[in-house]
Amino acid sequence: MSRTNFDTLLEAGCHFGHLKRKWNPAMAPYIFMERNGIHIIDLHKTVAKVDEAAEALKQIAKSGKKVLFVATKKQAKQVVAEKAASVNMPYVIERWPGGMLTNFPTIRKAVKKMTTIDKLTADGTYSNLSKREILQISRQRAKLDKTLGSIADLTRLPSALFVIDVMKENIAVREANRLGIPVFGIVDTNSDPTNIDFVIPANDDATKSVEVILDACCAAMIEGLEERKAEKIDMEAAGEAPANKGKKKSAKARLDKSDEEAINAAKAAAFLKEDEEA
């Protein structure tokens, strides 16, 4: 069963591409027709590509790995932040920090700096500083939080990147390509799908279009997370079963030994009684 359907995508306006003069020829396989100078995306292909991407994302989530969502354009910021948070995944909705992937250790240092500020503020270390110094530190903390707050839990490179506008987020895509990180992307008719591993041809300018596609993908990721949780519970239960079995066996051995000792004691008593009678 498909994660989404033609009518849902049509209602969300996923089929609207860009003006013909702005098109990228590499998107030709995904274009259905031209209407009033605007390219119309083939939604049947979009449905198939959403299913393909959703299944891959489900497996990534099931394996316990992270997917980094990227959307710095105004129309997609809020919806991406909400959907990514719903599956406990990191996201970037402000300016893409240069070297976010290729220079990840430096980014981690900045995140740790933010954590250190929080720790020192909580334990009262900064209470002896002047108001001006405290204000400077607070501003620095706010700046770091705005850019890196949503990736604070990302302790290692993500296993995949999910990009809303591959042309706008071209730096992020290039960094991922350089490191061999798979890229999922909503690709409009004016963009180049060449360096995108999982192409989802659709309107990347309409909030509703982005939301519908993310709904399908995140639903698949939730399934993956739930399956991972269920497997973990089963493994823990399986691990406890042999242990309990061993305990029962030991208890049985103790009972057998007690019975044997009782029998031997009874025999000894009978033997002594026979001696006395004799």
From Swiss-Prot:
Against InterPro entries, the record matches this protein to: Ribosomal_uS2 (IPR001865), Ribosomal_uS2_bac/mit/plastid (IPR005706), Ribosomal_uS2_CS (IPR018130), Ribosomal_uS2_flav_dom_sf (IPR023591)
Instruction: Cite a single GO BP annotation.
Output: translation
> What terms describe the molecular function in GO for this protein?
structural constituent of ribosome
Q: Which domain of life is it from?
A: Bacteria
| Alphabetized Pfam families for the sequence | Ribosomal_S2
Q: Where does the record place the region Disordered?
A: 233-258
Gene Ontology cellular component terms for the protein in this record:
cytosolic small ribosomal subunit
CDD domains referenced in this protein's UniProt entry, alphabetically: RPS2
Keyword tags: Ribonucleoprotein, Ribosomal protein
Q: Which family does it belong to?
A: Belongs to the universal ribosomal protein uS2 family.
The UniProt entry, under NCBIfam families, shows: rpsB_bact
Give the matching HAMAP family.
Ribosomal_uS2_B (MF_00291_B)
Q: What is this protein called?
A: Small ribosomal subunit protein uS2
Organism annotation: Bacteroides fragilis (strain ATCC 25285 / DSM 2151 / CCUG 4856 / JCM 11019 / LMG 10263 / NCTC 9343 / Onslow / VPI 2553 / EN-2)
